[in-house]
Amino acid sequence: MGLDEKEIDRRVRSAAYFVGLRDDQLDKSPFELSGGQKRRVAIAGVIAMEPKVLILDEPTAGLDPRGREAILAQLRSYHKQKGNTVILVSHSMEEIARNVDRIVVMSHSHKLMDGTPEEVFSRADELLQVGLDVPQVTKVAMELQKRGLLADSSVYTIDELVRRLLALKGGEAAC
């Protein structure tokens, strides 16, 4: 990368701080780190290179809910602060629904869908047909639609489902 030691040190410390690692953790053997700390070290190592496009494959796999949310919050912050593209490869549609503004669905090396979370999850039946899951809240909305309680099931967040149900309660159409 052609960087001097001072710049490398600055980037490493900045990336470590960014992902929530303390200075004393940087000196530890990888065998002394927890799974979440190892994941943060790996992400910090890539962030230190300041890529314009950051591609992460299952970055939260094996982490507890708190660790998953911390990593995802850091990635959202990275995207927001740097303006760089972050691509998440994941089978967790719950995480995807809450953390991205665009979804590309691939199956057998072919692009099946490309759109906003709302656009993609409005095609929940197709996602299920190709073996992908949908957010639990979408499944609830699908069941409510089957029972005639919702006009459509293109819901992917709890807040949106609550909004629609409250609109129904108030006598307004929820579609």
Which residues make up each language-model segment?
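Conserved catalytic motifs of ABC-family nucleotide-binding domains
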Residues: 50
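Catalytic Walker B motif of ABC-type/P-loop ATPase nucleotide-binding domains
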Residues: 54-57
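Conserved ABC ATPase signature
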Residues: 29-33, 37
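Hydrophobic anchor residue at the start of the ABC signature
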Residues: 43
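Conserved ABC ATPase "signature" region
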Residues: 7-24
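A short, surface-exposed alpha-helical micro-motif characterized by mixed small hydrophobic
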Residues: 96-98
